């Protein structure tokens, strides 16, 4: 009885020690993430959008850690050629982890070629970007990196583009293949009502949670959690130019409408966390 008691004490002690270590590691990652977000190296126009994009809350929800291998899918966008989230992820992962940028295939269009060139220039000369490993997400998608090697794959506001190109499920599949068992697939996307048809989603630039979860499950993912961090109840999803009416694009037919769309703010977005099962 005495030996059993000693054994239980030892087990409890080791469990507490492990829990304390994991908590300490989490605190270190949280501090490093806050430091990256508050860095003066970030582009001023990007920082102004923090109130809409909620980077600390979003990346914490995805449970990112500074020693992870993370793939960011097609990080550049029209008004964020150097990658809005990349400016946070690159310095955060630079020392102990790895950021892989699965960028555009430059042969697919002149616009994609220019976007990739701008991004690669930043990788070449910027001290925060120079440890980024470049990869490619083509249409149709091919292997992103070595199978079962990444801890996390992240995509921010890209799903509507892949849906329009006809390769959304295929992007999910190559993301699944790249992840280790237990790896996390983090998705942020303009959220369509579930009654939107595929044609509506392609035209308006919003994708439904229902379709996203369905396709992710079809390639093997399990939905672990969802969050309303990036929700915006002011967004009716009924705009003449779709999601592009809203900031930051503000594609308006009449300048007098700008204030109306600025008042709405950036889109209502789903924030979904999937995992690749361990077995």
Regions found by a protein language model. Give the residues of each.
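Conserved class I S-adenosyl-L-methionine
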Residues: 66-81
């Amino acid at each position: 009885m005495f030996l059993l008691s000693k054994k239980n004490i030892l087990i409890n002690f080791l469990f507490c020690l492990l829990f304390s270590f994991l908590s300490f590691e989490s605190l270190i990652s949280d501090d490093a993430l806050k430091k990256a977000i508050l860095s003066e190296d970030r582009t001023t126009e990007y920082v102004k959008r923090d109130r809409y994009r909620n980077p600390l809350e979003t990346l914490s929800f995805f449970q990112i850690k500074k020693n992870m291998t993370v793939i960011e899918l097609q990080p550049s966008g029209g008004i964020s050629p150097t990658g809005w989230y990349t400016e946070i992820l690159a310095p955060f992962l630079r020392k102990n982890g790895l950021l892989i940028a699965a960028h555009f295939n430059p042969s697919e269009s002149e616009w994609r070629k220019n976007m990739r060139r701008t991004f690669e220039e930043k990788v070449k000369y910027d001290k925060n970007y120079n440890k980024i490993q470049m990869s490619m997400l083509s249409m149709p998608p091919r292997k992103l990196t070595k199978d079962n090697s990444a801890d996390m794959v992240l995509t921010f506001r890209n799903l509507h583009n892949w849906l329009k190109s006809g390769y959304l499920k295929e992007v999910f599949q190559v993301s699944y293949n790249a992840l280790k068992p237990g790896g996390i697939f983090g998705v942020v996307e303009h959220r369509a009502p579930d009654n939107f048809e595929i044609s509506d989603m392609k035209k308006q630039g919003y994708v439904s949670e229902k379709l996203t979860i369905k396709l992710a499950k079809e390639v093997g993912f399990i939905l672990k959690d969802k969050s309303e961090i990036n929700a915006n109840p002011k967004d009716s999803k009924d705009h003449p130019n779709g999601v592009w009416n809203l900031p930051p694009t503000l594609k308006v037919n009449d300048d007098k409408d700008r204030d109306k769309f600025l008042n709405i703010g950036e889109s209502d977005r789903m924030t979904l966390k999937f995992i690749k099962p361990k077995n």
